[in-house]
Amino acid sequence: MKIFGTDGVRGKAGVKLTPMFVMRLGIAAGLYFKKHSQTNKILIGKDTRKSGYMVENALVSALTSIGYNVIQIGPMPTPAIAFLTEDMRCDAGIMISASHNPFEDNGIKFFNSYGYKLKEEEEKAIEEIFHDEELLHSSYKVGESVGSAKRIDDVIGRYIAHLKHSFPKHLNLQSLRIVLDTANGAAYKVAPVVFSELGADVLVINDEPNGCNINDQCGALHPNQLSQEVKKYRADLGFAFDGDADRLVVVDNLGNIVHGDKLLGVLGVYQKSKNALSSQAVVATNMSNLALKEYLKSQDLELKHCAIGDKFVSECMQLNKANFGGEQSGHIIFSDYAKTGDGLVCALQVSALVLESKQVSSVALNPFELYPQSLVNLNVQKKPPLESLKGYSALLKELDKLEIRHLIRYSGTENKLRILLEAKDEKLLESKMQELKEFFEGHLC
C-alpha cells in the first residue's frame, strides 16, 4: 500500500489520518531516521488546524515510544521547520499540515537533518517499515530508554532573524505600504513581525485562526479579498500565503494578481543582476508557460524543467547546481536561504526587487506577456491510468497536431484531474479544453 503522495502524507483527519495510523507512521519514520541518527532529536511543528493537536500527540507518542526526544514548537510555517531542523541539529523535522487544503484535511511532511524533503526512495523505505509488523512491535523502549518531549515557544525569533537576514542589508521597507493575508494559517504570527521590523507600513488580514478557518476563502488560493484591500488601502504590494506559508501569491499596486511564471522570470533576472545566481539556470516545472523560457533566454538564462512538486524543483536545482527555481503556483525556492518553498523569503525578495527597480509594482513585475493557458481541476471519482481510457491517445495526437501544449495528470494530494493547455490561439484553446472536460467527465466522474 502506497502511503506517500506528491507532498508527504495527506488525507482527512479522523478518516485516513487516524491516531493509530499516525502512530504507526511515526514509529516507521522514527526507525528510519534512527539508522543515521546523530542527535536523537526530532522537531515537530504544525499549522493552525484543529486536528493538528491530535496528529501531534500521536506522533509524539510514537517517537518517544522508540526512544526519540521530541521538540514541539507549535504553529510555524513549513519552511521554518526545514530551517530549524538543520539549525537546531535535529535528526529530522516533521510538519503537520495539509497546506492549501480545507481544514478537515491534514498531512505530515518529513525533512531530513539538512532540511530537505525526503526523496522517493526514502519514502519507500519508510513505507516498508510501516508494513513490517514484527519490526514495529519489537521497537518499543522501556525504562530510561523511553524518549522525552518538550515544548519550546521562543524559536520563532530564530526564524524571524533568518528571514531578515535574507533581505538586502542596504534596503529597508519604510517607503512601502504592504497588505498581508496570512490565510488564518501558520504565518499569522511571523509575517507581520518581519515586515514591521523592516519598516513597512503593514495591514494584516485573515490573521485570527480558530482551528477551522485556515484557507477559508482567503490566502493564496483566494486572493480576491487581498486584491480589494490593496486597492482600498492604496498599497504598493499585497502578499497572500497559503496555510503553511510555503506558497506565495503577489498582488501589485493596481490589485492585479501577478502570474507565478512572471514572478519566476523577473526574480530570476533580478538575482542575476545581483550576481546571486550560482549558475545560469532557473528551474521550473513542466507547467511553466513557454513565454517564461523565451524571456529567460533573452536574458541569457536557461530554463530547466522538472516534474510538478516543490521537492522535485529542489532536487532538479541540486542536480543543476542552481539556487533559484519554483512553480507557477507560488512555491518559489531561494536555496541560499530555504531548502523548500518559503513564501516569506520570496515576499521579501519581491519587495527588494520593487524597491531597487524604482518602479511601481505593476510595472516592475510585468516583464513579458504570457501565451494563453487554461488550467482546469476536475473532480474525479476514480483514477485509472489515463492511457487506458478509450480515445485518450487520439485526443493527445490531435492536440499535438494543432500545436497545443498539454499536461494532464492526477493530483497527488486530492481526487482531482489537472488539465493544462497552452496555445497561441485562445479561441482554439477554449474549444479544446471544453472537449477534454467532456471526455474526462464521461470517463472519470
UniProtKB/Swiss-Prot annotation:
Q: Which cofactors must be present for this protein to function?
A: Mg(2+)
Checking InterPro entries in the record gives: A-D-PHexomutase_a/b/a-I (IPR005844), A-D-PHexomutase_a/b/a-I/II/III (IPR016055), A-D-PHexomutase_a/b/a-II (IPR005845), A-D-PHexomutase_a/b/a-III (IPR005846), A-D-PHexomutase_C (IPR005843), A-D-PHexomutase_C_sf (IPR036900), A-D-PHexomutase_CS (IPR016066), Alpha-D-phosphohexomutase_SF (IPR005841)
User: Which modifications occur after translation, per UniProt?
Assistant: Activated by phosphorylation. Can autophosphorylate in vitro using ATP.
Where Phosphoserine occurs, the residues are: S99
A GO molecular function term, named singly, is: phosphomannomutase activity
| Residues binding Mg(2+), per UniProt | S99, D242, D244, D246
Where would you find the membrane-spanning parts of this chain? Answer: none
- A Pfam family that the UniProt record links to this protein: PGM_PMM_IV
Per the record, the domain of life is Bacteria
Entry annotation: catalytic residues? S99 (phosphoserine intermediate)
Q: Which GO terms describe its cellular component?
A: cytosol
Catalyzed reaction equations: alpha-D-glucosamine 1-phosphate = D-glucosamine 6-phosphate
EC number(s) in its UniProt entry?
A: 5.4.2.10
Q: Which NCBIfam families match?
A: glmM
**What name does UniProt use for this protein?**
Phosphoglucosamine mutase
